[in-house]
């Protein structure tokens, strides 16, 4: 088990510090089997050009899995049932966790170090709908997805900026969503990715459908492949991010109802 950094006295005094001490929620056996089973057939992957298929009813050919696609980009999908979680809680979490380091660390105490909101005034603007307090903001993140702590910039976008049909967000098709283009601290260096977290409300909670397209970026308002033709994203990077996603969202599903109940007004 990775060693957790000790909390400072100031952090230990925070009302949500107790969540840092919880054991990580085990990844379900069926998901571990997918991880161990190796990559899916790339033909099952959702092409980034077809991303609005997420709004279609039912499931897509791959809801849980990872691969390197034929064009060299990486793809991963995860489906997480989050019992007792509402779309409002999910939107709140993305705004709330970016304001203090420990809030991000309780999400995955072994692999998360900080997520720092660069647009605090917008995130704290109570006149905005909760999801819009994250849309259009930037998080500076330090996390470990398998290769040691790695700095990352996450630019959260309004869905229409990422080519999604934003008019369907907040409907039966999609209760809410978070999407971002991520890259290293120096744009153009390292591996970039397009991230989407798509939420459906179901009986007893929500279903979170996550998609990552690794090797893509947002350039001049268009989602483009940044990996040169003939070059592929290393499979171990895709597999590592898939494993991390299974872990972090499984744990968030376990803690979010209580974190929200106790801290929803604690900005």
Residue ranges and their predicted role:
Residues 14, 26, 33-128:
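Hydrophobic ligand-binding cavity/cleft-lining segments
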Residues 189-193:
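Amphipathic hydrophobic-ligand
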Residues 101, 115, 143, 220-221:
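Amphipathic alpha-helical interaction segments
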Residues 154-158, 194-199:
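Broad, structure-driven detector of short, well-ordered beta-strand segments within folded domains
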Residues 1-70, 184-188, 198-267:
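Terminal "cap-and-tail" regions of soluble proteins that handle hydrophobic small molecules
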Residues 75-79, 194-196, 205:
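Extracellular structured ligand-interaction cores
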Residues 112-187:
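Glycine-rich portal/gate segments that line the openings of hydrophobic small-molecule binding cavities
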